[in-house]
Design a protein with these regions (language model features):
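Short amphipathic alpha-helices in soluble, non-transmembrane regions
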Residues: 26-32, 110-112, 192-198
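Short, flexible helix-coil linker/hinge segments at the edges of structured domains or between repeats
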Residues: 38-46, 69-86, 123-128
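Core segments of cupin and vicinal oxygen chelate
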Residues: 46, 97-151, 196, 233, ...
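Surface-exposed beta-loop interaction hotspot
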Residues: 56-57, 68-107
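Short, basic/aromatic recognition patches
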Residues: 36-44, 199-205
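Short beta->alpha transition motifs characteristic of CBS
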Residues: 65-72, 160, 226-233
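Vicinal oxygen chelate
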Residues: 1-28, 50-56, 91-100, 143-160, ...
Length: 247
């Protein structure tokens, strides 16, 4: 097993958040996570009130951790409305796809989600990015799609310096590393709609345990699936995890 390149390409990481008073970084380190940040220290952004850490798990998968400082940030993340009440101080906020062509991949997901990105930025070269990625003169451009009303997002990121390379691997659903699922309320209708958009699935929807799923590749070769819970009110549905209404 090798460490995932921090510049991508592919589904680079998942992101975990917590309030600033929680030992988020320490919990991951105790389980063998290795910090990627320069000097092995969190990188704090006073603009956003967030402390950031990139790290590798014991198998070399990349992950991001964010400590949120302030009530407004926690409310925006859904913590005060959901996780705090359930005594769950750590939650996953996003999946991140690193790509050699951000705009192309964002157009692909725009067609899938039928919604516009809620934010697009370019992060200039500077000490913040250098320390976060442990790369001199790092420069990235990023866009985000909201996947529910508030707290869950998809991040699409392109390194401009050094440039994110093209993927040279054809991934399968069983390949090592990350894939992600998009929960839907009518999987047959979404399966047919996405097929009409030209998306190639590995198979029609199939019942796998508590879910009906159909796996596909996006235009960068990332593996994702549509999934619909057999019991829409069951404990493993998005509705159960997100009391604000799900995706």
């Amino acid at each position: 097993l090798t460490d995932m390149p921090v510049i991508g390409p592919g589904m680079s990481h998942t992101c975990y958040q917590s309030p600033i008073d929680q030992p988020l970084f320490e919990k991951f380190a105790a389980q063998g996570a290795r910090f990627l940040n320069r000097h092995d220290e969190p990188v704090y952004s006073p603009t956003y009130g967030v402390s950031y850490v990139y790290a590798y798990d014991p198998e070399g998968n990349l992950l991001e951790m964010e400590k949120l400082d302030g009530e407004q940030l926690l409310k925006h993340a859904g913590y005060l409305d959901n996780w705090d009440k359930d005594n769950k101080p750590i939650w996953m906020s996003q999946v991140s796809l690193f790509t050699p062509d951000r705009d192309r991949l964002m157009q692909f997901y725009h067609n899938i989600f039928q919604t516009n990105p809620h934010r697009i930025v370019e992060v200039p070269v500077g000490e913040f990015g250098d320390n976060l990625f442990d790369i001199d003169n790092a420069k990235v451009q990023i866009g985000w799609f909201r996947l529910n009303r508030q707290s869950k997002v998809m991040e699409i990121l392109q390194f401009l310096n050094p440039p994110t390379p093209q993927s040279m691997i054809e991934r399968e659903p069983t390949s090592l590393g990350y894939s992600f699922s998009l929960e839907v309320s009518d999987i047959e209708a979404e399966y047919q709609r996405l097929k009409a958009l030209g998306i190639e699935f590995f198979s029609p929807p199939v019942k796998l345990g508590r879910f009906v799923q159909a796996y596909a590749r996006d235009i960068d070769g990332n593996i994702f699936s549509l999934r619909q819970p057999v019991d829409s009110d069951g404990p493993f549905s998005v509705k159960a995890y997100d009391k604000r209404g799900g995706l």
